[in-house]
Each structure stands twice: as structure tokens, then as C-alpha cells.
């Protein structure tokens, strides 16, 4: 298995991303010595991990940007034939305990989304995994309006959590950012604050970007 070294500069990262554009996942996997799964039912994170490997991402599962030394987060985004994202985009795990004093400026959501390299990938299920092509990468930073929308949603969601109302939050809350259960196993539990101030158990939650938000990013970049 080949393991590319981390890029030493932003230009090098963008060059690597540009060289991937137009390749199939099968071609990329062959170059890295990776087997290609027949489907992604048991390998949901496989595409993201493949792209991370090719570009030399360093974070792994740590709560930091994928290219911390460059200040860049990497996000693969599955799209349909018209270029629309097929699913929401995972950002990070949501803190359900010890939230007192936590501010937007210090939040992991803000840190992760300060600068993102988006890599679109064909995602429609009728295309075999190996044949799905990689699109042109986009280096994106949120506009002041996008930052304000993200902050407002984050602060409202965190207020629910701090008041012990995490169970009342649904994926419908938030204009651009939503909170959803984040666990491969529905039986997984983590501690949370309850409405009466005691500590209870609930499913781990994660922050996700809603589809219209990421679709707007792609539209702005590709002018469609």
C-alpha cells in the first residue's frame, strides 16, 4: 500500500487535487494498492479515506483539520448527474457535556469550516464504485453571510444542549447546520445533560451541513 507524504504547501495540495480530477475511484485505488469494495454498505467512509490517503491528510480521526499545518479541512461530497449533493455533510461530533462557556469562536465546527477543500465524487448508486469519477476540487472559505448563518445555527443548537433539551432537537432545526445521531450502532450511548440538570444517556450526535448549503457552494464555484 502506497502512503503519500503530507503536502508541504497549499499549492502542492491543490496540485495533487487537480491531478485526481477525472480519475475513477478504481484508478485511484489501484495507484494506492487499495482493494475496491463492491458497494459501500459496510464501507461508508471508504471514499473519504481513499481521497485522504491520496492527498496525504494527517488528522485521521483526531478532532482537528485534515491538513492542520495548512489550515485546510478535506470534505468529499457525493453528487448526482446534475451536480447536486446526494447527502448532508458530516462536520464533527457535538459536545453534549461541559458546554458551559463554550463559544462559537472556539468551536470545532468553526475550526473545521474555516477553509475547506471540497472534492466532488459521482455518487449515484447505479454507477459501480470503481467507475465513479472524481470531480474538480474547490478550495472554499465561508463568506461573512455564510459564517453568520453557521454561527446562528450552532448557537441555537448548543443552547438546546446546554438546557438539557438535546432530545427535542431534530434534523429540521437549523437553516444550514443540523444535529443528528452519529453512531454506526444505534445502541451506542454517551452522557448528556437532562432538562432537570441531571446526567443521562443518549445517542452521540454530530453536526451536519444541510444539502442546500453545500449545493450553493458548488453552484458558486461551477456557475450552474
Swiss-Prot record:
Main location: cytoplasm
Protein name from the UniProt record: DNA mismatch repair protein MutH
InterPro entries: DNA_mismatch_repair_MutH (IPR004230), DNA_rep_MutH/RE_typeII_Sau3AI (IPR011337), DNA_rep_MutH/T2_RE_sf (IPR037057), Restrct_endonuc-II-like (IPR011335)
Alphabetized GO MF terms: DNA binding; endonuclease activity
GO cellular component, one term: cytoplasm
Purpose of the protein: Sequence-specific endonuclease that cleaves unmethylated GATC sequences. It is involved in DNA mismatch repair.
Lineage, opening ranks: Bacteria, Pseudomonadati, Pseudomonadota, Gammaproteobacteria, Alteromonadales
UniProt similarity note: Belongs to the MutH family.
NCBIfam families: mutH_TIGR, PRK05070.1
Domain of life: Bacteria
Amino acid at each position: 500500500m502506497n502512503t503519500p507524504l503530507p503536502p508541504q504547501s497549499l499549492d502542492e495540495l491543490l496540485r495533487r487535487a487537480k491531478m485526481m480530477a477525472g480519475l475513477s475511484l478504481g484508478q485511484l485505488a489501484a495507484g494506492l494498492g487499495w482493494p475496491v469494495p463492491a458497494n459501500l454498505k459496510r464501507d461508508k467512509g471508504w471514499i473519504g479515506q481513499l481521497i485522504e490517503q491520496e492527498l496525504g491528510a494527517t488528522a485521521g480521526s483526531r478532532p482537528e483539520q485534515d491538513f492542520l499545518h495548512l489550515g485546510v479541512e478535506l470534505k468529499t461530497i457525493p453528487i448526482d448527474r446534475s451536480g447536486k449533493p446526494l447527502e448532508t455533510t458530516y462536520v464533527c461530533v457535538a459536545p453534549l457535556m461541559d458546554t458551559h462557556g463554550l463559544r462559537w469562536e472556539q468551536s470545532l465546527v468553526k475550526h473545521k469550516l474555516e477553509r475547506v477543500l471540497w472534492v466532488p465524487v459521482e455518487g449515484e448508486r447505479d454507477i459501480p464504485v470503481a467507475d465513479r469519477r472524481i470531480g474538480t476540487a474547490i478550495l472554499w472559505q465561508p463568506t461573512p453571510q455564510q459564517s453568520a448563518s453557521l454561527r446562528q445555527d450552532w448557537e441555537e443548537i448548543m443552547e438546546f444542549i446546554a438546557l438539557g433539551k438535546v432530545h427535542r432537537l431534530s434534523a429540521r432545526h437549523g437553516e444550514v447546520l443540523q444535529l443528528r445521531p452519529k453512531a454506526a450502532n444505534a445502541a451506542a450511548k454517551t452522557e448528556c445533560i437532562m432538562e432537570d440538570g441531571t446526567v443521562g444517556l443518549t445517542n452521540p450526535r454530530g453536526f451536519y451541513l444541510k444539502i442546500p448549503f453545500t449545493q450553493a457552494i458548488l453552484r458558486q464555484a461551477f456557475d450552474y
